[in-house]
UniProtKB/Swiss-Prot annotation:
Its EC number is 3.6.4.-. Interacts with the RNAP. Has a higher affinity for the core RNAP than for the holoenzyme. Its ATPase activity is stimulated by binding to RNAP. Residues 164-334 form the Helicase ATP-binding domain. Gene3D superfamilies: 2.30.30.140, 2.30.30.930, 3.30.360.80, 6.10.140.1500, 6.10.140.2230, P-loop containing nucleotide triphosphate hydrolases, Tandem AAA-ATPase domain. ATP binds at residues 177-184. One of its GO terms (molecular function) is ATP binding. Keywords: Activator, ATP-binding, DNA-binding, Helicase, Hydrolase, Nucleotide-binding, Transcription, Transcription regulation. PROSITE patterns: HELICASE_ATP_BIND_1, HELICASE_CTER. The lineage of its organism: Bacteria, Pseudomonadati, Pseudomonadota, Gammaproteobacteria, Vibrionales. GO terms for biological process: regulation of DNA-templated transcription. This is RNA polymerase-associated protein RapA. Transcription regulator that activates transcription by stimulating RNA polymerase (RNAP) recycling in case of stress conditions such as supercoiled DNA or high salt concentrations. Probably acts by releasing the RNAP, when it is trapped or immobilized on tightly supercoiled DNA. Does not activate transcription on linear DNA. Probably not involved in DNA repair. Residues 492-668 form the Helicase C-terminal domain. It comes from the Bacteria.
Length: 969
């Protein structure tokens, strides 16, 4: 190692110091000054951990003054190099740059430059980088991209709808599933896919004010999508950053009332150019042909300006035909322009439904049914399919022929592409509800306080008095003070304590209307019996609620009881529990359904017990009996409840306010009759055809099977743990499928993407993640994995390595060079390039003669035979064979050209095949189904042309390389 003053070297152990200059020499030591980091280092001359920096012809080097030189010749004189070449800014030729004037901040971006400069990575980092490239490639190509990473059970109809809609260009659809079937999750899955595929970058969600937090939590917990709630206060704050506050965030959540009441904010929202608009509870938007409501006009204005629109609404039958038409008008006003024409067209779908029902049942088709199908599919020859169905062919062939006919008929179904609707009746897997009504005597303390309250509270409106009478404990506290212990004598509390003691192993969810009741109940359980309980109410932050929910979910040492207030429990689901206690009752049937829906959801494994303790002779008894006998709302979902309530509310409020229940039997009888009639109408209006289409049948099951197979991916676990190790995260295995990940002091970057400052508990198991809301569900799509991979790539981790191969069959010193190339098409994400040509790794294994052995030498098995080399020795090995490495890279560059051409051709072929078949299908359908929008066809046509250009220009570059040297010891 010969040093000379002015030479440039780089430290092998501290590469972040920059480029060093030899400033002093004596017999035994050498001093280097690193000007970029203002540090000096003194090393022993005979064994300094530094590498000489030499650039080659073709490299571009930077001068300290900031200009760059393309090297055409390298001259050495007295141990110092001078680079001759052309300046890139002025194009002046024959410029000489002495090495002492090279920029101190020089960075080695090419992997071979890093290798020559001694900046050699650990072998396991090289392996991690290659695996990251390979896995990213496979994830991008997967047809299930965007569906695997959400924290939700694998429920066929939800996944089918998300898969159908999420891949469309600017989807405009109506999601009208019945309550408890997970419309919010379907919408979230569609949003998630649109975001991952680059189709939607700016998203606006408009919901009723009470549901804002529920949406915020669901999007964050289930899909790792961080929305910002916008209200007047937030808009005023954001005004400092931008004239239009809506431009300050990509994902915005706001209430319809906020936009309805402020014309200024509505106009700003209109100007903000969204890619996707999501509207929840869209059935509350009132419309009539001559007088649409303000709320409807707000949504209509946004829907006209936004390419993608998702409307979440109650079932069409609950809405009524005209109201249902009004929702469809928001999606496509050209198509749904006239209500009368819509009604007439709907009537024509009856024969389609009959034909499909006949095909579904598998019975022999009558001539009439065949004629109907032939007429409906007039543009294609269906005779061969009929022949297969009626022949002696095997069952599978018959099923395929039937399915083809069904698919073709479905496509022609008027609203099949814009409307998805599932019912509990059409979807199996819901638990039975066991109802336990428990009448209890009213304590004398309550009787007294209620009588006094009635005497002095004469000014209250009937509705307010009715509400007040439902909560006798509050009336008692008005007289006895906030601190009075009503829970010492209330028989509902005594009953609850006995129940909890009798069923120690069962998790119990208790819901009370008020936060104060919930808090006092927790105190009662703790003080009277030492029962482990936790509370959940609207006064708590999202993080506090998460902790409470996690404590309740915990198997070992968790809370036996979770006590929720009405608002606090919105949007939270506790499917792992099956015992529900309603400590009091809500005022309206929708809230009752929402309470039961905390446990009675798709995915609940057991039947659920609903316990309703109520005080006899009080408003509670009136309500309990009306819900039970008038609506049967405890035992079954009650889509008609609200309508019945609106009809009988005056009599009901009168009884609740007065405490008299003489007319109760009559009101119950009237309600039951009305309920039956409404339910019969709903059943009559059910669109069987739409249900068949919405639940996805066999196709939905296949999607579930595919995602379930990916769920057990052990590759992901080992990859994630190596990734966290490399970046410098602490990992602590907590058992029960949980690992705690926290930032360390030795991290590669100051903060890790997707990881909170205090760390996070993660799990790779979907079921664990579903029962423990405090855990992150880690999948290939999770920001912690995606962000970690981006970090590896951008920080150049693992781009060059040196390994030893102990193999006595080969001569000592035999060289192999592993080259990893990446083929890349520079294209915007929204173009859809990722589906056909994502960043594609190509691996070559060059022997010393320049032959590629990658076909015979598989990466993982070969990697297991290699051992790492320390950086200093690696640097010496590289220096001794630098010319060979140069030669082999040139040979690799020539060899890889053929691979790149093959990859381009395959991508072109797949893209043409996939998009052209979709285009032809839509064009053929356009002739028979007006629901195909021109924009959709034009978008696919433009996409094909665009992608053709991008794919043909795809380039390759050397991403990483590994030198392998054979040794025998």
């Amino acid at each position: 190692m010969a040093f000379a003053l002015g030479q440039r070297w780089i430290s092998d152990t501290e590469s972040d110091l920059g480029l060093g200059t030899v400033v002093a020499l004596d017999a035994r030591t050498v001093t280097l000054m690193f000007a970029a980091s203002e540090e000096n280092r003194v090393y022993a001359s005979n064994d300094a951990p530094v590498t000489r920096v030499v650039f080659n012809v073709g490299d571009v080097v930077e001068c300290q003054e900031g200009w760059s030189l393309k090297v055409e010749q390298v001259v050495e004189e007295n141990g110092l190099y001078t680079y001759l070449g052309t300046r890139e800014d002025t194009e002046e030729t024959g410029v000489a740059l002495r090495e002492i004037f090279l920029s101190n901040q020089i960075r080695f971006n090419k992997p071979q430059d890093k290798m020559y400069a001694g900046q050699i990575d650990r072998m396991d980092n090289f392996v991690l980088r290659y695996r990251a490239l390979k896995n990213q490639y496979e994830q991008h190509r997967s047809p299930m991209r965007g569906l695997c990473g959400m924290r939700a059970g694998l429920i066929p109809h939800q996944l089918y709808i998300a898969h159908e809609v999420g891949r469309r260009h600017a989807p405009r659809v109506l999601l009208a599933d019945e309550v408890g079937l997970g419309k919010t999750i379907e919408a979230g899955m569609i949003i998630h896919q649109q975001v991952l595929l680059g189709r939607a970058e700016r998203i606006l969600i408009v919901v009723p004010e009470t549901l804002q937090h529920q949406w915020l939590v669901e999007m964050m917990r289930r899909f790792n999508l961080h929305f910002s709630i916008f209200d007047e206060e937030r808009c005023v704050e954001a005004f400092a950053e931008s004239d239009n506050p809506f431009d300050t965030q990509q994902y915005v959540l706001c209430s319809l009332d906020f936009l309805r009441k402020s014309r200024k904010r509505f106009e700003q929202a209109l100007e903000a150019e969204w890619d996707l608009l999501v509207v929840d509870e869209a059935h509350h938007l009132e419309w009539s042909q001559d007088k649409p409501s303000r709320g409807y006009q707000v949504v209509e204005g946004l829907a006209e300006r936004t390419p993608g629109v998702l409307l979440l609404t109650a079932t069409p039958e609950q809405l009524g035909r005209e109201s249902h038409f009004a929702r469809l008008r928001l999606l496509d006003s050209d198509r749904f322009y006239d209500y009368a024409a819509f009604v007439e067209e709907e009537a024509q779908y009856a024969p389609v439904a009959d034909a499909i029902t006949a095909l579904f049942s598998g019975v022999k088709l009558a001539d009439e049914a065949k004629n109907q199908i032939t007429e409906l599919l007039s543009e294609q020859d269906v005779e061969p399919l009929f022949r297969i169905i009626e022949s002696n062919a095997d069952e599978e062939s018959k099923a395929i022929a039937r399915q083809e006919l069904i698919d073709n008929l479905m496509d022609r179904h008027g609203t099949g592409r814009v409307l998805f609707r599932n019912t509990r009746a059409a979807i199996k897997g819901f638990p039975v509800r066991n109802v336990h009504l428990l009448p209890m005597p009213i304590p004398t303390q309550y009787t007294t306080s209620m009588r006094v309250s009635g005497m002095i509270g004469g000014k209250l409106a009937p509705e307010a008095r009715a509400m007040k009478n439902l909560y006798p404990e509050e009336i008692f506290q008005e007289f006895e003070g906030e601190e009075s212990s009503w829970w010492q004598f209330d028989c509902r509390v005594n009953w609850l304590l006995e129940k909890l003691k009798a069923q120690r192993s069962e998790k119990v969810l208790v819901i009370a209307s008020r936060a104060s009741t919930a808090l006092q109940l927790e105190q009662a359980l703790r003080e009277r019996e030492g029962i482990r309980a936790t509370v959940f109410h609207e006064g708590m932050s999202i993080l506090e609620r998460d902790k409470a929910a996690a404590y309740f979910a915990q198997e070992e040492g968790g809370a036996q009881v979770l006590i929720c207030s009405e608002i606090g429990s919105e949007g939270r689901n506790f499917q792992f529990a099956n015992q529900l206690v309603m400590f009091d009752l809500p005022f309206n049937p929708d809230l009752l359904e929402q309470r039961i829906g905390r446990l009675d959801r798709i995915g609940q494994k057991r039947d659920i017990d609903i316990h309703v303790p109520y005080l006899q002779g009080t408003a509670q008894e009136v309500l309990a009996r009306w819900f039970n006998e008038g609506l049967n709302a405890f035992a079954e979902t009650c889509p008609t409840g609200r309508t019945v309530y609106d009809q009988v509310s005056d009599q009901l409020i009168e009884m609740l306010a007065s405490g008299s229940n003489e007319a109760l039997d009559d009101v119950i009888a009237e309600s039951a009759k009305l309920n039956q009639a409404l339910k019969a109408d709903l059943e009559q209006g059910r669109d069987r055809l739409l249900e068949m289409h919405s639940n996805g049948g066999e196709k939905a099951q296949q999607i579930v099977a595919e995602i379930a197979a990916k769920d057990g991916d052990t590759n992901l676990v080992s990859f994630a743990l190596s990734l966290f190790d490399t970046i410098g995260l602490n990992q602590d295995d907590k058992g029960e499928n949980a690992i705690v990940v926290t930032p360390s002091e030795h991290m590669m970057v100051p903060s890790y993407p997707g990881l909170p400052y205090e760390g996070a508990t993660i799990t790779f198991d979907r079921d664990t993640a579903l029962s423990r809301e405090d855990m992150h569900f880690i999948s290939w799509e999770h920001p912690m994995i995606q962000g970690g991979i981006d970090l590896l790539m951008s920080e150049g981790v693992g781009t060059c390595a040196v390994s030893l191969l102990k193999n006595k069959a080969l001569p000592v010193g035999t060289l192999l060079l592993e080259l990893i190339y990446a083929v890349d098409a520079q294209a915007p994400k929204r173009s859809g390039i990722g589906r056909f040509l994502p960043r594609t790794p190509i691996r070559l294994m060059m022997d010393a003669r320049g032959n590629d052995l990658s076909g015979q030498v598989e990466f993982e098995s070969f990697n297991r035979q290699l051992s790492p080399v320390n950086r200093h020795l690696a640097s010496k090995l590289v220096s001794s064979v630098q010319n060979d490495i140069h030669r082999l890279i040139e040979a690799g560059d020539q060899l890889v050209v053929e691979n790149v051409e093959a990859i381009r051709q395959q991508a072109q072929q797949e893209m043409q095949q996939s998009l052209n078949s979709e285009l032809e299908r839509l064009q053929a359908l356009k002739a028979v189904n007006p629901n195909i929008r021109d924009e959709e066809i034009e978008a696919i046509d433009a996409q094909i042309k665009e992608l053709n250009g991008y794919i043909s220009k795809a380039q390759f570059q050397l991403d990483s390389l590994r030198l392998i040297v054979v040794s025998h010891n």
